[in-house]
């Protein structure tokens, strides 16, 4: 297991066909974007995530504790993902969490992981002297008067006046070489009464920040940059009768993110684009610098952004529950069963942002009397407060009829008929809805020859009423050559399988707005959903 706080990063290079792209190192926000066989559609190109048989968000997947997971499988081709119809165009990630097994005594597992997070590559930056030489060459090539005299170049080179002619490596000034990450997990699994099986898991993750000067930040605001996450999961299986199995799954997640008022991505953007000669970190009197003899002040001091621009706190509470019942219907025909899933998820978010500006001054040298000259650049303000709260709710109903039977020890037939409906709502808005039916039939002979057909008829309300549903068929065939007696293989080859498939899948993530089909286009429009002509 990779010691990562975000599950998506643990999959990098582990599954064929899965591409992971990590774009941030901010604690709690370092998830990778996932793509199966690259970008395949317009709009959203992320795969559908299915956890224990039910669709979930990629955030739910990202924040899973790796110790809860039994297996992760990706469905890449149209045949395997067509059951998901209108949501399957970008492939499917199927996650199965751990469940209890029959054992005489409970199995208790405790895991501790400590990790060091370190940027593997940062941009190389010029020094102020190297920058000045480039400006000198540019002026010479353009036939312009050189902006830096030889005397000024010597001062910059020697660093004899770091306040008027600063040379600041902002990466070294703002970022630490590494930060710590801690993970703790405890699992308990077992059985009772011969009918009950359980798996219970609890975990805690803490990510530190790569930003320096956290003692100053904590002194100013009484908070510390961090990411904390608590995970809980309970999977219980009950054999109510010899024909009826009941499954009760509960899961929860509590997250807290704290950081400077300026978002981490903005901090990184600032230090990436800031010139080494733009300003000193501090002036001779200890105030924050703004501008220099080489550049007039027009941007905020990165040190002040990290330590004195305010702070944010983000709390996320997620609770989900799934109730499932599976009943064997062998009295109708052997291998037939019916299964019902009902799942509910509630996500509560509370974001608080408190921002302020800070004092900074442009040091312009000394006057004739030797007094330092300072020009105010920014003035400290009171903390402003912005609060936002919202709730997301998901309900999912799934009804399945399954058939799985083997005849004469070589002919295996399996089939499934499935109907489902998903509702997602945020605060008091009308819920988003998905619904559809799908079926699958598969045959294999002697585990050598495989045939499969899938049909999906799924709908999304992101489309006009008469165009919400689509028909998604698929077919596949496979042949395990390595099991043929007439083929002799060397010992180092264990499996050769040919497989071909064809199918149709869809994608309804075509835009950020909900009912794109009623977007208005009006001359002179300025409101959202209108187009400005001319």
What are these regions (language model features)?
Residues 75:
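Conserved residues at the C-terminal ends of beta-strands
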Residues 1-48, 54, 61, 67, ...:
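Membrane-proximal, glycine/serine-rich, low-complexity loop/turn segments characteristic
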Residues 27-29, 55-57, 78-80, 422-424, ...:
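Short acidic loop-to-helix transition motifs that present clustered carboxylates
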Residues 58-59, 81-83, 174, 209-211, ...:
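A generic structural signal for short coil/turn motifs at secondary-structure boundaries
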Residues 46, 182, 235-244, 250-254, ...:
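Extracellular/periplasmic, surface-exposed regions of secreted and cell-surface proteins
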Residues 359-360:
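Active-site-proximal polar cores
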């Amino acid at each position: 297991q990779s010691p990562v706080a975000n599950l998506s990063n643990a999959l990098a290079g582990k599954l064929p066909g899965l591409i992971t792209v990590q774009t941030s190192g901010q604690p709690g926000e370092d998830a990778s974007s996932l793509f199966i066989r690259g970008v395949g559609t317009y709009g959203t190109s992320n795969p559908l995530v299915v956890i224990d048989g039910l669709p979930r968000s990629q955030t739910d997947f990202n924040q899973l504790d790796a110790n809860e997971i039994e297996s992760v499988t990706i469905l890449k081709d149209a045949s395997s993902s067509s059951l998901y119809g209108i949501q399957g165009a970008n492939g499917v990630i199927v996650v199965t969490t751990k469940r209890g097994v029959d054992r005489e005594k409970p199995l208790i597992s405790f895991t501790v992981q400590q990790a060091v997070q370190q940027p593997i590559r940062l941009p190389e930056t010029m020094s102020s002297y190297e920058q000045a030489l480039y400006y000198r060459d540019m002026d010479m090539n353009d036939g312009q008067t050189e902006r830096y005299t030889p005397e000024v170049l010597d001062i910059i080179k020697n660093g004899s006046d770091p306040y008027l002619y600063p040379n600041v490596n902002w990466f070294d000034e703002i970022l630490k070489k590494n930060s710590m990450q801690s993970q703790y997990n405890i699992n308990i699994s077992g059985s009772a009464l011969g009918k009950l099986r359980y798996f219970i898991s609890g975990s805690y993750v803490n990510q530190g920040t790569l930003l320096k000067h956290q003692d100053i930040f904590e002194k100013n605001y009484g908070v510390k940059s961090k990411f904390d996450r608590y995970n809980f999961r309970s999977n219980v299986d009950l054999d109510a009768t010899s024909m009826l199995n009941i499954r009760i799954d509960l899961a929860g997640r509590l997250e807290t993110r704290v950081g400077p008022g300026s978002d981490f991505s903005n901090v990184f953007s600032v230090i990436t684009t800031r010139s080494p000669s733009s300003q000193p970190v501090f002036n001779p009197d200890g105030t924050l610098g703004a501008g220099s003899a080489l550049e007039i002040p027009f941007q905020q001091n990165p040190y002040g952004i990290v330590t004195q621009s305010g702070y944010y706190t983000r709390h996320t509470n997620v609770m989900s529950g799934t109730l499932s019942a599976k009943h064997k219907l062998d009295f109708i025909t052997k291998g037939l069963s019916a299964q019902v899933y009902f799942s509910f998820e509630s996500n509560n978010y509370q974001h608080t942002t408190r921002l302020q500006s800070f004092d900074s001054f442009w040091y312009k040298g000394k006057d004739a009397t030797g007094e330092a000259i300072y020009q105010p650049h920014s003035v400290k303000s009171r903390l402003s407060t912005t609060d936002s709260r919202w709730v997301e709710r998901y309900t999912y109903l799934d009804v399945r009829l399954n058939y799985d039977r083997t005849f004469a020890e070589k002919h295996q037939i399996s089939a499934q008929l499935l109907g489902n409906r998903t509702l997602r709502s945020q605060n008091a808005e009308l819920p988003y809805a998905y619904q559809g039916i799908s079926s699958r039939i598969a045959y294999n002979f002697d585990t050598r020859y495989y045939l499969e057909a899938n049909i999906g008829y799924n709908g999304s309300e992101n489309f006009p009423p008469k165009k919400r549903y689509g028909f998604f068929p698929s077919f596949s065939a496979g042949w395990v050559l390595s099991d043929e007696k007439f083929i002799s293989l060397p010992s180092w080859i264990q499996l050769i399988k040919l497989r071909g498939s064809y199918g149709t899948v869809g994608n309804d993530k075509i835009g950020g707005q909900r009912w794109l089909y009623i977007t208005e286009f009006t001359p002179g429009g300025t409101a959202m959903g209108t187009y400005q002509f001319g």
